[in-house]
């Protein structure tokens, strides 16, 4: 949903196709996890997400995903950076693609424009009991923060029949300024949502960041749940309600309440440096239960390491 993201995505597609690489191009703005999910579904070599995540609106960026759907290792991204500094394939790496450049490039027979969101929703439906949740008489307010998570929750629960649940989305339209804030699920960015939670009596509030790979939450009345609280609740649910066991992985700036809960539930604990890229390798191991970071990224057993 950032300014000119479609143009950047098209340029990346052109360059990959010009190097005889098959490309699936999303037909709409999509969450970063949708790219990761599609990579795994298709057995792709990797993927690219055009996003600047939770950063200010003036920025855009280039996320690289590997064949497992996780963020590329630092060795890979550093190699790409060095290559850009030393190479200039097709004469396009130092300037924007113009109409003349497009005319010089070969056709794109290896490019398929398709939905990445639809198969992502199907993966989410397999990962959780969406039909059971959809039957619950819950009012949920979803703050999309003008990002690529817009519409996702509504579509997801429509797959479950949506018999009792009511999903209301706010800030779900495209605004390349993100309403004047950084699209990050922090309390000071969602005061308008806190007011609605209280006045309209919602049972739960969910907040996505700009590319919908991180989450925040609110309880009835509008009290903001920190990512620290969310991690503790997720771990409690997995160990107490589902009775799962396994390794608990956290970045070192996550609350020590996770340490204490891991101890009393008999789960081994691993603490990593900041950044989900340090957590993702543990998620590839069958004995890992959950991994999470302070900025709101979480992943659990049986899901993509993202």
Residue ranges and their predicted role:
Residues 1-59, 155-218:
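N-terminal small/polar loop signature for handling phosphorylated ligands or for N-terminal nucleophile
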Residues 13, 17, 36, 81, ...:
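Predominant activation on well-ordered alpha-helical scaffold segments within soluble catalytic domains
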Residues 17-22, 132-140, 239-246, 263-265:
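Short, surface-exposed connector motifs at secondary-structure boundaries
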Residues 27, 82-120, 219-299:
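Proline/glycine-rich low-complexity loops and linkers
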Residues 30-33, 55-58, 71-72, 79-80, ...:
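Short gly/pro/ser/thr-enriched loop/turn and capping motifs at secondary-structure boundaries
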Residues 44-59, 197-220, 224, 267-306:
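Glycine-rich phosphate-binding loop
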Residues 46, 139-141, 249:
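Conserved beta-strand elements of the Class I
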Residues 60-200:
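Gly/Ser/Thr-enriched, mixed-charge loops and adjacent short helices
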